[in-house]
Amino acid sequence: LKGEKALYFESRATTQFACQYDSRFSYCAYIPENYDENKSDRYSLAVIVHGSMRNAQQYRDAFIDFAEETNTIILAPLFPGGITEPWESDSYKFVRVKDVQFDQVLLAMVDEISKRYRVASDRFLLHGFSGGGQFVHRFFYLHPDRLMGVSIGAPGNITDLDTSAPWYVGVGDYEEKFGVSLPLAQMRRVPVYMVVGGDDLETWMINDKDAPFWKSGLEKAGNTRVERLRTLRDSFEREGISVRYEEIPGLGHEGFQVLPAVKAFFQTLLPPR
């Protein structure tokens, strides 16, 4: 150990650490109380991706109970606004924008935390809601081999598995854009959960055709987040990707209220303690 002061900031609810791969980005973590530097057992990893409000630490804190119950380390990345241009707030949702590869930033964070703690980082759990839901399903398209399971919560815009539409409306030019073919066989092996509030029906934000990242064709997925997540589910199932799908009655666009259902899904994927 590097001393009590260092250990204090690196245990349980950690401080915010700059990502060494690219210090414009940072992350915090939660390390279960029973973690012992002198033991050899490895902990599972769950990555929780914030939405547009960037409340990464709040999401980390909301998973403390899950971490303690399941011996899971929680990683909560922070993708600040204004990265690709001043005042923009959406670029991370689309995974790769201009010269920024947000998926590689996240993988670098996973690598960094795996060097500090005994964590099974080769495959991890991934959840995101709203803007985070946009990021995680597109990350899934790029790196299914790294995922133990993915939870997609109420994304405002979706990337349909439609080969007739260009990225990020569809995946028609996926190979041209990313240099590899869409890894459908690997995607079929990853457990997928989709969740949205049954009353998540506001449309003003997700149908703004003047928004910087709007593309013609996004509207074809539906008018509301509920309709769009149903479209994404149907898209997955047409390609043989099994989906556990849930609309929570009476719930609007409330990311913290879906977490009990997300945790229940994650628990089905972890080995019993």
Annotate each language-model stretch with its function.
Residues 1-45, 58, 127-129, 134, ...:
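A domain-start/cap signature at the N-terminus of enzymes
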Residues 23-25, 41-122:
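Serine-hydrolase catalytic machinery in alpha/beta-hydrolase-like enzymes
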Residues 78-82, 156, 251:
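Short beta-to-alpha linker loops that shape the active-site pocket of alpha/beta-hydrolase fold enzymes
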Residues 149, 154-239:
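The feature captures the conserved acid-bearing segment of alpha/beta-hydrolase catalytic domains
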Residues 226-273:
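C-terminal catalytic histidine-bearing segment of alpha/beta-hydrolase fold enzymes
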